[in-house]
Amino acid sequence: MKKLKSYYMQVRNQQQSLDRKWILPLAIGSICSLFLLLLTNLASSSGQTRLIPFSVYGFRSSVFVESKINPVSVSLTVSVSPPPPPRLAYLISGSSGDGQMLKRTLMALYHPNNQYVVHLDRESSPEERLDLSGFVANHTLFQRFQNVRMIVKANFVTYRGPTMVANTLHAAAILLREGGDWDWFINLSASDYPLVTQDDLLHTFSYLPRDLNFIDHTSNIGWKESHRAKPIIIDPGLYMSKKADVFWVSQKRSMPTAFKLFTGSAWMMLSRPFVDYFIWGWDNLPRIVLMYYANFLSSPEGYFHTVICNAREFTNTTVNSDLHFISWDNPPKQHPHHLTLDDFQRMVDSNAPFARKFRRDEPVLDKIDSELLFRSHGMVTPGGWCIGTRENGSDPCAVIGDTSVIKPGLGAKRIEKLITYLLSTENFRPRQCR
């Protein structure tokens, strides 16, 4: 993490560098003042010797005041504590038949200091949604920390239509209103799964500026211009009470000139300032772009990308990655391959914190649980906040300690490698909104 922290000290903007120039003179002045205070105390008229120990990292000396006073060893040490861990806000969404997998993903991602919104769309049966609702309401940890919410009034979600964007905006608005303080918003599906513990993720992101947005994007839309941008689609999920697939109208439209189109992955990790921006839309760009994408095929793969790359204040905050391991055809099709045990080592070697797409009860998930997350069946992923024992199959998180304690493992080193690569001179600025 020292390399990562050192790198970010270099990429801070000029104003921040200028603001820090007064720190060294202030520190020197403070030390001199304390030194004079020490001398004053040592030579006090009462004749009593009063010692005031103080410290500055890396400095040791002996102070002599008159020959009758013994040398005083002054150990000056400034303890540098690690930065506070961020708080993450997750949306985990699913459709019919995803209830059990959604629960598993939630348990694998759980940490008391994070916030979670879960959603099963209206294609799911009432029984499946009630089962998830009961699970959230009755889980001991969720009850105690009150940080898991379910969208009870379910939305229709069509992946290829704007209803998925609407659902993401819905969850983000709930988290802004009810989720308290958090730093990044992460949207996942029930088919996603973590490859690292939350302690690994929180530790690594402690050292990053909180305004970074991890979003895979490009303006080179290629074939998508003729197949997605120019055709006009209608998503019945916006106005019908039953789910139906999108349909096309005969007329086509020209490419927009009021803003530039971008495309990329539908999965992202967005900063709170950017989430505030696209929910509130104070310069109206997010609303204008949203209305345009209401008739755009696969709008989740373009809406947020187009907004962030056309909003001047956020363009330079983008990191061109979705932080996922995904196995695609070449050229990519609508959906990626389902991951299996054969993909396990490639997942680990990717250094990505998340992977998709998994089938329910795929054996590779058990391998991820045991070898990467150290999670037992039916339990949350343990972290530094879990101080119970594992004896006789006990849940270590049944006994809760300090929730601010983070104990990163090998997963943190893998994420650090990925982040260092993404923020290198060759990959960071040159790949922003191009």
Curated annotation (Swiss-Prot):
EC number: 2.4.1.-
Transmembrane segments: 22-42
Principal subcellular localisation of the protein: Golgi
Gene Ontology molecular function: glucuronosyltransferase activity
Subcellular location: Golgi apparatus membrane
Alphabetical UniProt keywords: Glycoprotein, Glycosyltransferase, Golgi apparatus, Membrane, Signal-anchor, Transferase, Transmembrane, Transmembrane helix
Class of this enzyme: transferase
Glycosylation site residues: 138, 187, 316, 392
Pfam families: Branch
Cellular component GO terms held in the UniProt record: Golgi membrane
Positions in the Cytoplasmic compartment: 1-21
Lumenal side: 43-434
Membrane topology designation: Single-pass type II membrane protein
Keyword check for Cell membrane: no
Family designation: Belongs to the glycosyltransferase 14 family.
Functional description taken from the UniProt entry: Beta-glucuronosyltransferase involved in the biosynthesis of type II arabinogalactan (AG). Modifies both the beta-1,6-linked galactan and beta-1,3-linked galactan present in type II AG.
Protein name: Beta-glucuronosyltransferase GlcAT14B
